[in-house]
Amino acid sequence: MMKVLVTGADGMLGRDVMRALREKHVNARGVDVADFDVADGAAVREWVTAEKPDAIIHLAAYTDLLKAETEPAKCIDVNAMGTLNMVRAALAIGAKLMLMSSSEVFGAAPDVIHGTRDKTCAANV
């Protein structure tokens, strides 16, 4: 049976993803900031290596838009470096990685459907 690690499992989207995985009887382990900080590369490697998931669904993100303006370094640590840490950990054990983001990474382009290869132009992190 496939083993899936879900980061950001206590978040709005994470709870729904965990519920959907459980309904499909997927062996899923949800983690959140209480378990480890995705910005801490050593902690990410330790968790991912110990869990040895076949796939990682990376939902952990710094989502407080107001605080992101006053705490840009924390936002970058979680959203950019945290994602890089998850990519590196997945590569190290040969796990598949699914990254969730939002259309905001493409900038202000109303009524446009974007593809996976479209250039990003985020106004924020």
Place the predicted regions along the sequence by residue:
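Helix C-cap/helix->beta junction micro-motif
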Residues: 24, 51, 92-93
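SDR active-site strand-loop-helix element
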Residues: 7, 31, 56-60, 97-103
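N-terminal Rossmann NAD(P)H-binding glycine-rich loop of SDR-like oxidoreductase domains
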Residues: 2-23
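Adenosine-cofactor binding site in Rossmann-like domains, unifying the SAM/SAH pocket
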Residues: 22-46
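NAD(P)H-binding glycine-rich loop region in Rossmannoid oxidoreductase-like domains
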Residues: 41-78, 89
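Catalytic helix-loop patch of NAD(P)-dependent Rossmann-fold dehydrogenases
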Residues: 70, 77-85, 92, 96, ...
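Glycine/Thr-rich phosphate-binding loops of Rossmann-like dinucleotide-binding domains
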Residues: 14, 65-66, 106-109
